[in-house]
Amino acid sequence: MSKAYEQSGVNIHAGYEAVERMSSHVKRTMRKEVIGGLGGFGATFDLSQLNMTAPVLVSGTDGVGTKLKLAIDYGKHDSIGIDAVAMCVNDILTTGAEPLYFLDYIATNKVVPEVIEQIVKGISDACVETNTALIGGETAEMGEMYHEGEYDVAGFAVGAVEKDDYVDGSEVKEGQVVIGLASSGIHSNGYSLVRKLINESGIDLASNFDNRPFIDVFLEPTKLYVKPVLALKKEVSIKAMNHITGGGFYENIPRALPAGYAARIDTTSFPTPKIFDWLQQQGNIDTNEMYNIFNMGIGYTVIVDEKDVSRALKILAEQNVEAYQIGHIVKNESTAIELLGV
């Protein structure tokens, strides 16, 4: 490496070490459809091996938001990668797509190989769990763009679904049932508010909350719904799905409903994790607003015919997912969501 480049703030050797450290984690994620190895200019994936008649590709990209600030401040980098994958694959899953491959982007003030390895390990762990190949990525050292120790993580996922099996909400009808799949906690949305409330409260994040350190509760990774939902889709006709992310119930559930229909949700039908009670009390936040910011304990929803509810709940239980019948579909021309009990 030239001295001029090093003096400009770019350490190529640290980048090489980071790649070497992450390679074993990346290799764990490979699928048989991946062509070639690491280091190429473009990553390749053989769709013909999927044995699909008319595959539709579904893509999604997302980041982790300011949850990163907590991870950086407390030096806990191993679960943020899980969040990055979950935010992308859970989104494309709502179409019925099986995630195929993932690419990551990490930008940082300075490449610290040990930190990059922890981030990529988390990404790889999530990719292994969802059978998604981590086929490419970029690590950019940009000292003038970020403060010391800071980094950003984003991801891009591609999946595929048979054209005839594509889930778009067009079959939603009155009387169908909304099933909610439990979240693991806050997931990756609302953290600008969360961090504000943490700062205002003055709490010690190493202290315990509900038998766990506060910091572990706040950094609990976003739940991955791919395996249980794909297992459910094989057995039950799913009419629509939603990933409950930014905007909570109010912004996300209507996205999968056709005009003239609403989801009537009974908020007493599922448990709300205690951390949401803490946030609401700390910020004196109206309950309706809480449902417009956070997932409130439900990270993903599926809509099925009433006759399929018992079978759906049984399948999800077999997949070790807590799920609840949280509402049903009604006709409504004025709003797409009705929340009862708030």
Curated annotation (Swiss-Prot):
EC code: 6.3.3.1
Cellular component, GO, one term: cytosol
Main localization (coarse): cytoplasm
Keyword set, alphabetical order: ATP-binding, Cytoplasm, Ligase, Nucleotide-binding, Purine biosynthesis
Pathway as given in its UniProt record: Purine metabolism; IMP biosynthesis via de novo pathway; 5-amino-1-(5-phospho-D-ribosyl)imidazole from N(2)-formyl-N(1)-(5-phospho-D-ribosyl)glycinamide: step 2/2
One biological process term in Gene Ontology: 'de novo' IMP biosynthetic process
Covalent S-S links between cysteines: none
Cited CDD domains: PurM
Entries under InterPro entries matching the protein: PurM-like_C_dom, PurM-like_C_sf, PurM-like_N, PurM-like_N_sf, PurM_cligase
Localization per record: Cytoplasm
Keyword Cytoplasm part of the UniProt annotation: yes
Catalytic activity: 2-formamido-N(1)-(5-O-phospho-beta-D-ribosyl)acetamidine + ATP = 5-amino-1-(5-phospho-beta-D-ribosyl)imidazole + ADP + phosphate + H(+)
UniProt cross-references to Pfam families, sorted A to Z: AIRS, AIRS_C
One term of GO molecular function: phosphoribosylamine-glycine ligase activity
Homology family: Belongs to the AIR synthase family.
PANTHER family from the UniProt entry: TRIFUNCTIONAL PURINE BIOSYNTHETIC PROTEIN ADENOSINE-3, TRIFUNCTIONAL PURINE BIOSYNTHETIC PROTEIN ADENOSINE-3-RELATED
Protein name, UniProt field: Phosphoribosylformylglycinamidine cyclo-ligase
Organism: Staphylococcus aureus (strain NCTC 8325 / PS 47)
